[in-house]
From Swiss-Prot:
UniProt lineage: Eukaryota, Fungi, Dikarya, Ascomycota, Saccharomycotina
GO biological process, alphabetically ordered: chromatin organization
Organism: Kluyveromyces lactis (strain ATCC 8585 / CBS 2359 / DSM 70799 / NBRC 1267 / NRRL Y-1140 / WM37)
Spans of repeat WD: 120-160, 167-207, 213-253, 255-295, 299-339, 356-396
Residues of the site described as Important for interaction with HAT1: L272
Keyword presence, Nucleus: yes
Main location: cytoplasm
Protein name: Histone acetyltransferase type B subunit 2
């Protein structure tokens, strides 16, 4: 009798995680995983002085990050500042140790985050962002759409927010400080509104401007990195809109078939914009010709929820999503030739996939001090800090004739 082959069973999430753990020594120079008491919907590295200190004969560099809480109705919520002490070889760009030595070293790294400061917070922290021009000033957004401002310079133990701003009527996830104008803060809400605040004037509780151009939930808002008056928003109304604070009307509007959840402006090219959302693809756009994408990248298997360009590497874009994955994209590899075996692993621009999370990724952040050092939080209370191995993270280099805005 002919034997009937049984269909291959799909890999479980825990089996995928175990496989990822087994590959950590080959793929990473550093991995730290911490189970938080409560989930954090947000995470962002804080700019921290690069001054190593000696602890038990070892040089350690402390880095700090923002997280929040999403608790039950009976438990208080907090904005928290966490810290991790990293070995000097993790924070440098020196070549990695050999694989055998590194495997032993990784197995003994037990760096865990410590909560060094916390602020009482009304309702859950949906987003937390520091002001680039004054990093001790931190803004948050809560489940009612209220914006809070905190000041780390105030040392009282139980000190709360120094100001709150109310305009939105519903929850929100869009929050962004202007990188070029001090004190300008954008917030976006599920009620379809976007507000611009001047946080340097805490006595004024009204928005400087409001933008009511969307007809559904506003999923994200981001400032342009070079032009101080430009910002973008994406919404469940299937539009991406470019705004100018000098105008009362949208200056560009793109309608798409599937809603975008997130967008990001390039930190190197003033015309390059990325957006992604419910169809799982990441799209690249030229602001001068917004109606047609330059390129789309497939790699995620579910909605993409966060996008960020690297602050260090030109052409490096990172995305995360509900598929539990974080993908680094090397835009300079778009269109590169592939061997058939390589094509099985994804498109040529898919540089690295971080598969260490076992539930949807809420948010991630690039460290502005240490190239390639990342942090990420997931729905199931886990915070990971990780750095890909130096041997695989050569800085992306464009071909001499490469122009991202000529892609079709």
């Amino acid at each position: 009798m002919t034997e009937v082959e049984e269909p291959e069973q799909p890999t479980t999430i825990n089996e995928e995680y175990d496989l990822w753990v087994s590959n950590v020594p080959m793929m990473y120079d550093f991995v730290s995983e911490t189970r938080l008491t409560w989930p954090s919907l947000t995470v962002q590295w804080l700019p921290t002085e690069m001054q190593p200190r000696e602890v038990d004969g070892q040089q350690l560099l402390r880095q700090e990050l923002l997280i929040g809480t999403l608790t039950t109705d009976n438990e208080p919520n907090y904005l928290k500042i966490a810290a991790i002490d990293l070995p000097e070889n993790v924070t440098s760009s020196k070549p990695s140790v050999s694989d055998d030595a590194k495997e032993n070293e990784l197995s003994h790294r037990q760096s865990k985050i410590k909560i060094v400061r916390k602020f009482k917070h009304e309702q859950e922290v949906t987003r937390a962002r520091y002001m680039p021009q004054s990093p001790n000033i931190i803004a948050t957004l809560n489940g009612a759409g209220i914006v809070y401002i905190f000041d780390r310079n105030i040392k009282e133990k139980d000190h709360g927010a120094i100001a709150s701003f109310s305009y939105h009527k519903e929850n929100g996830y869009g929050l962004a400080f202007n990188p070029t104008v001090s004190g300008q803060l954008l917030s976006a809400s599920d009620d379809g509104t976007v507000a611009l605040w001047d946080v340097t004037s805490t006595a004024n509780k009204s928005p400087s401007q409001t933008f009511d151009v969307h007809t559904d939930i506003v999923n994200d808002c981001k400032w342009h990195e070079f032009q101080s008056s430009l910002f973008g928003t994406v919404s469940e109304d299937n539009t991406l809109i470019i705004h100018d604070t000098n105008s009362d009307r949208a200056i560009q509007k793109l309608s798409v078939s599937s809603a975008f959840n997130t967008l990001a402006f390039s930190k190197r090219s003033e015309n390059l914009l990325a957006a992604a959302g419910t169809d799982s693809n990441v799209y690249l756009y030229d602001l001068r010709r917004l109606q047609k994408p330059l390129h789309s990248m497939a790699g995620h298997e579910d909605s993409v929820t966060s996008l960020e360009f690297s602050p260090h590497q030109d052409g490096l874009l990172t995305s995360s999503g509900s598929d539990r994955r974080i993908i680094m994209w090397d835009l300079f590899n778009i269109g590169a030739e592939q061997q058939p075996d390589d094509a099985y692993d994804g498109v040529p621009e898919l540089f690295m996939m971080h598969g260490g999370h076992r539930s949807p990724v809420n948010e991630f952040s690039h460290n502005s001090n240490v190239p390639w050092l990342m942090c990420s939080v997931e729905e199931e209370n886990v915070l990971q800090i990780w750095k890909p191995a130096n041997k695989i993270v050569r800085p992306p280099q464009p071909p001499a004739d490469f122009d991202i805005t000529t892609l079709e």
